[in-house]
């Protein structure tokens, strides 16, 4: 770059409103679910999500790349599923708002190309073609001015004809107009901007797109409508033809993108069902909501214009229940763990049928003991009914991944379980220039759930199944989880260390802050209750999300209040700047503009501050030794006042 030249400035940033609900529509989400979405999103990404929800017309692939947000730590356990559900909610909300933009565009275009303005536009087109004398007929262009099916090919053919007319008249775009071309896609990423020749035409088109996107209910304008009859030129007629043709094509392209986005939202929900099925196996109490969601998706695929509200309601309702289940959602890892265990069981079973022990590639033990120990059978010495063995590799036996629900007979009985026969584990290979796959059917998910539940209740799987069948009849009580908290240390509470005590004492003696914690008295033995990193919440939600405190820790505490809880680290606001797509970088620019700090005021200047005395009495490099310092004259003038 040559010295003294400046880099070209980016396109101007739009101004889009973001309400308190981050532009989530009330006709798609209830107040409870909108509040849930706001609680899950961090404050730093809230404005950016509001811009995405506004519905700026965009290609589906660009919108997929732009959607970005952060989930609060309070929802860390459900984060893998919450991220996908929030993304679907943003896409559906964007679709509805963008559909309203298209409806306004169609209405405004019909109003613009109507009498008496229609007659004046056609007269200008006729004068334009006659003056050019290129053989271009006015009918070849006017037939598309009122059409709703101006495809990209039709648009290119019409623009070629207009370019012939433009070249014949010797019209060219001015450098000032070309410098303003980026404004044409600020409020609409689907618009194909034509080569307007004047600054006035570029600004007028940008204002029209801005009014339509922001739904200001202002009529579309063209140069023919705002200029008097005596002041209209052939160049104005040419720019009006550019405007009408590209807006007609924008109308069709926007409609096609909305159809693709509508189908893509349903497809994302359909793909999410694979993960939601394993989430259902982790929290069986979500059975009814999950079944309702799948049935709704089946109906949505059968309609050309499905309603998103029932589907979004079931998704957020399922997410709420999964969050209340308080388990780590890991559908992909759970899928793979089930495959590893079932494949090992199958290999051992096949070896026993052949009269062999272990796998073919494994050596036998020295004492000849079968290799069934490779299944990692683990004994449970705390069980009451003798010695029990369970699969230690069964992830359903982990209480943080799968937890036996209350009244398990309502959800874990065989006839209440939702079967999925085609649960596949797929591996990809490359053979002879082709991609091949190996599939394994996972058909024992229910057995793994029962084995994991029996381990948590300290029963054999057979006894656990008997209780499930007899409990609804009142013959037996519901199986309950066996707690072993007294065998392990309680890591959810820890005493205040000396360093923390000294720092807390020093902070209490100084100016008190809202997050300061007062020390208990020396006669009291109370401890400071803290939360682990996985349960950090904001100060506004710490009382609602709850703490994972064990019963033993609660019995040993004395008057623990919310002020004694450890506060989470303050999270800095984070705005995502996407410079390639200007409509969505306004949040970052707006954020920086409000956080910019003013420079400190200059040092005081007065009689005591000259080049011979004062805090900066050292000779300055900007003045020569023989040049008078302007501060000397200022000091003399102040002395004579």
Swiss-Prot record:
Chain spans, region Disordered: 353-373, 500-572, 587-641
**Record keywords:** Host cytoplasm, Host nucleus, Host-virus interaction, Inhibition of host innate immune response by virus, Inhibition of host TBK1 by virus, Inhibition of host TLR pathway by virus, Viral immunoevasion, Virion, Virion tegument
Q: Which residues form a coiled coil?
A: none
Q: Where is the composition biased (Acidic residues)?
A: 358-367
Return the Basic and acidic residues bias intervals: 632-641
Q: Where is the composition biased (Low complexity)?
A: 500-563
Name of this chain's protein: Tegument protein UL35
């Amino acid at each position: 770059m040559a010295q003294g030249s400046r880099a070209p400035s980016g396109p101007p940033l739009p101004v889009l409103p973001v309400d308190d609900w981050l532009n989530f529509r009330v006709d798609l989400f209830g107040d409870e679910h909108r509040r849930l979405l706001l609680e899950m999103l961090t404050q730093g990404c809230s404005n950016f999500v509001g811009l995405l929800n506004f519905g700026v017309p965009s290609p589906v692939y660009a919108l997929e790349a732009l959607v970005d947000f952060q989930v609060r730590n309070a929802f860390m356990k459900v984060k893998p599923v919450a991220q996908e559900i929030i993304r679907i909610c943003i896409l559906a909300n964007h679709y509805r708002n963008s559909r309203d933009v298209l409806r306004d565009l169609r209405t405004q275009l019909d109003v613009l190309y109507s009498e008496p303005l229609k007659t004046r536009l056609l007269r200008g087109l006729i004068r334009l073609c006659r003056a050019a004398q290129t053989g271009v007929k006015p009918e070849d262009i006017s037939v598309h001015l009122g059409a709703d099916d101006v495809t990209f090919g039709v648009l290119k053919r019409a623009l070629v004809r207009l370019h012939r007319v433009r070249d014949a008249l010797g019209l060219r775009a001015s450098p000032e107009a070309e410098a303003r071309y980026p404004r044409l896609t600020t409020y609409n990423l689907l618009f194909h901007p034509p080569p307007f020749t004047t600054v006035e035409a570029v600004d007028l088109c940008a204002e029209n797109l801005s009014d339509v996107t922001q739904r200001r209910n202002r009529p579309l304008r063209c140069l023919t409508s705002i200029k008097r009859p005596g002041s209209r030129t052939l160049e104005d007629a040419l720019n009006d033809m550019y405007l009408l043709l590209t807006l007609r094509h924008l109308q069709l392209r926007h409609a096609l993108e909305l159809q693709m986005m509508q189908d893509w939202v349903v497809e994302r929900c359909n793909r999410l069902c694979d993960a939601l099925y394993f989430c259902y196996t982790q929290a069986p109490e979500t059975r009814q909501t999950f079944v309702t969601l799948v049935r709704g998706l089946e109906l949505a695929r059968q309609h050309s214009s499905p309603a998103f509200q029932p589907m979004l309601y079931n998704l957020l309702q399922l997410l709420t229940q999964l969050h209340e289940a308080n388990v780590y959602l890991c559908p992909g890892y759970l899928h793979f763990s089930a495959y590893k265990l079932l494949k090992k069981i199958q290999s051992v079973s096949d070896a026993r049928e052949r009269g062999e022990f272990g796998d073919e590639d494994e050596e036998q033990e020295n004492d000849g003991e079968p290799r069934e120990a490779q299944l990692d059978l683990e004994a449970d010495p705390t069980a009451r009914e003798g010695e029990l063995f369970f699969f230690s590799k069964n992830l359903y036996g982990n209480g943080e991944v799968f937890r036996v629900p209350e009244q398990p007979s309502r959800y874990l009985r065989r006839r209440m379980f939702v079967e999925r026969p085609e649960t596949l584990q797929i591996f990809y290979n490359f053979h002879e220039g082709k991609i091949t796959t190996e599939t394994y059917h996972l058909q024992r998910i229910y057995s793994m759930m029962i084995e994991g539940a029996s381990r948590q209740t300290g029963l054999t799987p057979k006894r656990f199944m008997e209780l499930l069948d007899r409990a609804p009849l009142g013959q037996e009580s519901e199986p309950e989880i066996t707690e072993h908290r007294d065998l392990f240390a309680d890591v959810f509470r820890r005493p205040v260390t000396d360093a923390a005590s000294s720092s807390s004492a020093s902070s209490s003696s100084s100016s008190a802050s809202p997050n300061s914690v007062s020390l208990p008295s020396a006669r009291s033995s109370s401890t400071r209750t803290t939360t682990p990193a996985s349960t950090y919440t904001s100060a506004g939600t710490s009382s609602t999300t709850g703490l994972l405190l064990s019963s033993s820790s609660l019995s040993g505490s004395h008057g623990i209040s919310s002020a004694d809880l450890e506060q989470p680290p303050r999270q800095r606001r984070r705005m995502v700047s996407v410079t390639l797509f200007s409509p969505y970088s306004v949040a970052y620019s707006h954020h920086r503009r409000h956080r910019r700090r003013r420079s400190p005021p200059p040092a005081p200047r007065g009689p005591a501050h000259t080049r011979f005395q004062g805090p900066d009495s050292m000779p300055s490099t900007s003045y020569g030794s023989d040049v008078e310092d302007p501060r000397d004259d200022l000091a003399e003038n102040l002395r004579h006042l």
